[in-house]
Curated annotation (Swiss-Prot):
Membrane-traversing stretches: 51-71, 85-105, 124-144, 166-186, 194-214, 237-257
Residue window of motif NPA 1: 108-110
Sorted UniProt keywords: Cell membrane, Glycoprotein, Membrane, Repeat, Transmembrane, Transmembrane helix, Transport
Carbohydrate attachment residues: 4, 13, 26
InterPro entries from the UniProt entry: Aquaporin-like (IPR023271), Aquaporin_transptr (IPR034294), MIP (IPR000425), MIP_CS (IPR022357)
Function summary: Silicon influx transporter responsible for silicon transport from the external solution to the root cells. Is coupled with the silicon efflux transporter LSI2 in both exodermal and endodermal root cells for an efficient silicon transport across the cells into the stele. Silicon is beneficial to plant growth and helps plants to overcome abiotic and biotic stresses by preventing lodging (falling over) and increasing resistance to pests and diseases, as well as other stresses.
Pfam families listed in its UniProt record: MIP
GO CC term, one of those recorded: membrane
Example of a GO biological process term: silicic acid import across plasma membrane
Full protein name: Aquaporin NIP2-1
Species, as recorded: Oryza sativa subsp. japonica
Length: 298
C-alpha cells in the first residue's frame, strides 16, 4: 500500500512540476505533455491485451457453441440438443478461468454494456470490447462455414413461433445469466472460486430451456456472426434488444438487492483466494500503468 501511494504521489508531484521557465512566462504548457497524458488516460497500456483476449475468447465461444449447433442441426445422432447446451456452458466456464483475470471474459456486448452502465467497467473501453467481440464472433462463424461444409446453417438463432415469444424468453434467460454474473464477479462475499462454474451453469441451464423457443442466444455477437455467415437474418433485432434488456435489468436487480456490509473497525474480513488473486493482479496492472505513464512523461 505504501508503494502504491508513493507512486501515486510521485505521479501527482511530477504533473505539477514545470521544467521550462519559458512556459510560465508565455502562459503556455507543452502540448506534447497534454497529448501524451490524454492518450495514457484514455488508452491504458494493457488495453490491447484485453482486446486480444476478448477476440480469442469470443472466437472460441462462437466456434464451439455454433459448431455444436450446426452439426446437431445436420445430424442429431452426432450431437444432441442437450449436448449443444452443455458445450455452450462449458466453453463459457473455461474462458472465464482462462482470460477472466485479463479482460474479464465478457465475450458479450450486452454484458459489457451492463457493466459500464453500472460502473463496473470504463465507458472509454466499451467500443474496443464491442469491436473485439463482434470480430471474434464473425471470424469464428466464417471459419466454421468452411470447416463443416456442406452445412449451410452455422448455428443461427431464429425465433420459433411469434417473435414476441422469443423476445420475452431472451430477456428472461439473459436476465438470469447477468444476475448470476454480477453476483459472482463484483460481490466479494460470493464464492469467487466458483465464478466460472456458476456463470457457465447459468448459460447451460437457460439454453436448455430457451433453445427450443428462441435458440438461447443471450449474446448479440453470438447471433450476428452466424447470421452473416449463413445469410439468415430472421428476427435479428430480437437478439440485440432482448439480451440488452436482460443484462440491464439483471444488473439493476442485483445492484438493488445487494447488501452493502460496512465492516466494523478492527474486524477481519478475508477475501476468497480467487478474488484475492484477481485483486492483486489488478493492483499490479495499475502499478505498471503508473510506471509506464511516468516513463512516457520522462
Amino acid at each position: 500500500m505504501a508503494s502504491n501511494n508513493s507512486r501515486t504521489n510521485s505521479r501527482a508531484n511530477y504533473s505539477n512540476e514545470i521544467h521550462d521557465l519559458s512556459t510560465v512566462q508565455n502562459g503556455t504548457m507543452p502540448t506534447m505533455y497534454y497529448g501524451e497524458k490524454a492518450i495514457a488516460d484514455f488508452f491504458p497500456p494493457h488495453l490491447l491485451k484485453k482486446v486480444v483476449s476478448e477476440v480469442v475468447a469470443t472466437f472460441l465461444l462462437v466456434f464451439m457453441t455454433c459448431g455444436a449447433a450446426g452439426i446437431s442441426g445436420s445430424d442429431l445422432s452426432r450431437i444432441s440438443q442437450l449436448g449443444q447446451s452443455i458445450a455452450g456452458g462449458l466453453i463459457v466456464t473455461v474462458m472465464i478461468y482462462a482470460v477472466g483475470h485479463i479482460s474479464g471474459a465478457h465475450m458479450n456486448p450486452a454484458v459489457t454494456l451492463a457493466f459500464a452502465v453500472f460502473r463496473h467497467f470504463p465507458w472509454i473501453q466499451v467500443p474496443f470490447y464491442w469491436a473485439a467481440q463482434f470480430t471474434g464472433a464473425i471470424c469464428a462463424s466464417f471459419v466454421l462455414k468452411a470447416v463443416i461444409h456442406p452445412v449451410d446453417v452455422i448455428g443461427t438463432t431464429t425465433p420459433v413461433g411469434p417473435h414476441w415469444h422469443s423476445l420475452v424468453v431472451e430477456v428472461i434467460v439473459t436476465f438470469n445469466m447477468m444476475f448470476v454474473t454480477l453476483a459472482v464477479a463484483t460481490d466479494t462475499r460470493a464464492v469467487g472460486e466458483l465464478a466460472g462454474l456458476a456463470v457457465g451453469s447459468a448459460v447451460c441451464i437457460t439454453s436448455i430451456f430457451a433453445g427450443a423457443i428462441s435458440g438461447g442466444s443471450m449474446n448479440p455477437a453470438r447471433t450476428l456472426g452466424p447470421a452473416l455467415a449463413s445469410n439468415k437474418f430472421d428476427g435479428l433485432w430480437i437478439y440485440f434488444l432482448g439480451p440488452v434488456m436482460g443484462t440491464l435489468s439483471g444488473a439493476w436487480t442485483y445492484t438493488f438487492i445487494r447488501f452493502e456490509d460496512t465492516p466494523k473497525e478492527g474486524s477481519s474480513q478475508k477475501l476468497s483466494s480467487f478474488k484475492l488473486r484477481r485483486l492483486r493482479s489488478q493492483q499490479s496492472i495499475a502499478a505498471d500503468d503508473v510506471d509506464e505513464m511516468e516513463n512516457i512523461q520522462v
